[in-house]
Each structure stands twice: as structure tokens, then as C-alpha cells.
Amino acid sequence: DEEGIIENMKSFINAFSWNKGFKQYFAVKATPNPYIMRLLQKLGVGADCSSLAELILCEKVGITGHDIMFTSNDTPYVEYKKALEMGAIINLDDITHIDYLENNHGSLPDTFCVRYNPGSLKEGGNTIIGLPEEAKYGMTREQIFEAYKQLQAKGVKHFGIHTMVVSNELDIDGLVGTAELCFNLAVDIKKELGITVEFIDLGGGVGVAYKPE
């Protein structure tokens, strides 16, 4: 099993070797196993966390800083606090959490990511996690522009965009379509706000073909 994990991950990372800024994050909730986390860490893979328990797992295996992407929903401050103490990238799910974080923590880190819900703009791909327009997660396009304005005014310097509208996706067109939505949004943000989106986080993951067909 270990050899298979290493071989597959090396192959996946190599497929994106043309992109010098590429970084793979492993969704800890998928398999919260510290041995697998250590194995992937040795290959340069970060951790995508969505709870305090997952952050603690990362801490135990030595994953810290921007090697952690903290993406959660309806998040209590105690979880944000732990993520901030570990230097994780905070991926904001809700625009109201900007003030919530500042009021509770007293200051904001210089890097933030925001979670984009494209609603009906999404085309193609599977619906394992449902339709975006019916989902509880993420911000609308208008909210993201407002969130960026607020964050910039509060001193944030580095910005990212995240979205997760597919899961275990086997259709290349669905994956490409999701990426295009985010990159087009980044271009519009640069044009309208003058803010450069430095990284784009495509959640959901490339699917695994469990059967030969």
C-alpha cells in the first residue's frame, strides 16, 4: 500500500511539474491517518483541514504553516485560533467571518483565501456534493469582491481563491471548467480591484477510476 501511495503521488505531482508553484494538499478528513500524513509530507504534500481534530493531527506529525489549508464551515473561534497559531492559510467560507475573526483574535494574518461558490455558473462535472446554488458553503462573486476590499483595508497582502464544486471527478472537462471559473474570477479581481490573486486552490480532487472502464 505504501509503495502504491508513493508511486501514485509522485506521478500526480510530476504531471504538474510544468507549474513551479504547484502544491498538492491532502484532505485529512478523507483518511485521518498520521502514518499516511507523514508519508505524504515527505513527498511535499500539504494538508487540507476542516476541524480542530485535523489540525491537532497535523501538529502531531509536524505539518505547520502554509502547508496547512484550513477550510471549514460555521467555524468556532477556538478552531480559527488553533489554525492561526499554527500559521495555516485561512480559507474563509463566510464574509461575516472577517469581522468575527478580527473581533475575537485582535489581528489578521497577511494571507487569506476565500471560498468561491459559483452558483449556476458551474458547467459540467459530477454532482456528488450537490449543486453549488443549493449549497451552504462559500461566497458569491459579489461577496468575494467585497471580502477582498475589506481584507485589503485591514492590511492583508496575499490573496487566494478556493472552490469545491466537484468531488472524485473523472471528467477532465469538469475539472477544466472549474479551473476556468476561478482563473477568470482572478482576472476580473485584478482588473476591478488591482489585487493580484497569488494562488488558486481547486478542491474536490481528481477522481480515482475504481473499475477498468
Show the residue positions of the predicted features.
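A conserved active-site cap/scaffold subdomain adjacent to cofactor or substrate pockets
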Residues: G204-E213
